[in-house]
Amino acid sequence: MKKGITNGKANGLFGSNDSCTRAQIVTFLWRAAGSPAPKGTAKVPADVLPGSYCYDAVAWALENGIINGLADGTFGVNNTCTRGQSVTFLYRAMGTAPTTVNGFTDVAADSFCADAVAWAVENGVTNGTSATTFSPNNGCTRAQIVTFLYRA
């Protein structure tokens, strides 16, 4: 919060155990990158309203290949960000190709997040939820996301 990457919620609380939405993580990444102005080249999905807190962040992330929209054409502003999505966004924003292969039984080699998971574990961003599982479809809390950002 000191660096302005995240904000608290109402009543002076951070909401550590609250689910982190896709809009929130992208906004955190955008702020960590210095809040660069988008170039105006991205087709921003209709569920990201102009003037909303995340509009510029989503536009920037789309322009830089950090995120994609969902299959239904939306961004999923209020959807909970999963572990697989969160490490993928971080990897695309900050990562370099991993030198190892992820060894988790629940992350297939052809999964959208396979390289990102390997990168995140290799670089100490996060671990699996057990020795053999990563749980890529589990939601992330705000505390987990800011921890991932700090470690990345």
Predicted segments, located by residue:
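Feature responds to low-complexity, polar/acidic, surface-exposed segments characteristic
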Residues: K2-K3, N7-V26, W30-D56, E63-G84, ...
